[in-house]
From Swiss-Prot:
It comes from the Eukaryota. Keywords: Transferase. One of its GO terms (biological process) is alcohol metabolic process. GO terms for molecular function: acyltransferase activity. PANTHER family: ACYL TRANSFERASE 4, OS05G0315700 PROTEIN. This is Alcohol acyl transferase 1 allele GSd. It comes from Malus domestica. Involved in the biosynthesis of volatile esters which confer ripe apple fruit flavor. Alcohol acyl transferase that can use a wide range of alcohols as substrate to produce esters. Expressed at very low levels in the cortex and skin of ripe fruit. Pfam families: Transferase. Belongs to the plant acyltransferase family. Its EC number is 2.3.1.-.
Amino acid sequence: MMLPSVLQVKRLQPELITPAKPTPQETKFLSEIDDQESLRFQVPVIMCYKANPSLNKNRNPVKVIREALSRALVYYYPLAGRLREGPNKKLVVDCNGEGILFVEASADVTLEQLGDKILPPCPLLEEFLFNFPGSGGIIGCPLLLVQVTCLTCGGFILALRLNHTMCDASGLLLFLTAIAEMARGAHAPSILPVWERELLFARNPPRITCAHHEYEDVIDHSDGSYAFSNQSNMVQRSFYFGAKEMRVLRKQIPPHLISTCSTFDLITACLWKCRTLALKINPKQAVRVSCIVNARGKHHNVRLPLGYYGNAFAYPAAVSKAEPLCKNPLGYALELVKKAKATMNEEYLRSVADLMVLRGRPQYSTTGCYLIVSDNTRAGFGDVNFGWGEPVFAGPAKALDLISFYVQHKNNTEDGILVPMCLSSSAMERFQQELERITQEPKEDICNNLRSTRIMSMM
């Protein structure tokens, strides 16, 4: 079925969803990891569900989710508040119970007709997550915008936009899981939320004990042609990495790295190299890639309660001059990525918190020679079940300037990874060419395998 030439989405006026019961009226402080200048933006997430009459006959997803949101906000009541700015631009949460913004909508289209249009970079995102005037700010605005759009097939799309200073992906998932549990009839979340942002406050006295290349200024040898300040020239596409692409990339890696190399590491090294080539960066220019590393779990020794829903990550940066990155085999970039990720531990995270205090919350560089990547393939968005089963797709809706989110995607019958990328139109064409070249099977392998290159570009 073809997608209609003009998509008709009817939206009711937005409403504020408040906690279902009275909640504490108080002021809460964010941690230094939350209160970073670089997190003062909103993250869009999209979740798409098929109709499931056997599970939810005659139940309205808008009504179910609206009520579950209100009940979940009793436990996550700071999300119903507003951010205020104190001395030195320090953010605090005014827990005033004003509520989150909720929009009910319907569209004359089926999920099947939408096809790949629901995947990052989701060209129809503005239809399914309308930017109501006054909803996009950081200070004094709703911390969460949710739009539920019912489709003619009986399925629906839940799209949301979250103020990143409040939660990271793991924290948002805790909140969404609580909503989903209540939508399915639970009286309380199975994991109770924990605020306790003081666990990641700066130390007294603060002390920077690690190198933090992600916050360092670099000497700019460029002509500024790849700066991200001119948004009118930027385009978004997504690229698919399946079994064939990963097999070709692994053949380019020296034996001593293969056994310890993750799929995320390898894709990141590949993107970093191809993007640097595509941007035609001055050979002397320092280029960086940062990997967002979750501090939760035993691996990094950061002791946080199970229900902690604040930001708990760092993004250590790998650094290289453009020339060796572009001229060396892929193993060069891979080794740098692995070494940067290995620096992450509790001391690194606490050093970041202290740096925020001592250096006045510096932001990462916004030049095109910097890339930030986040692995959302195991974030758990695909497990969120409001009563209609698991979503056919769930995750970040698009790339954000310098930030690319890796998401799980099934291409036909194969599980792979979809990576949205944001670049200028000319650089995007070169990037796609470089990516096709580096993932192209040698001719002798093609003859044996008879499979064509499947790097996909989704407009």
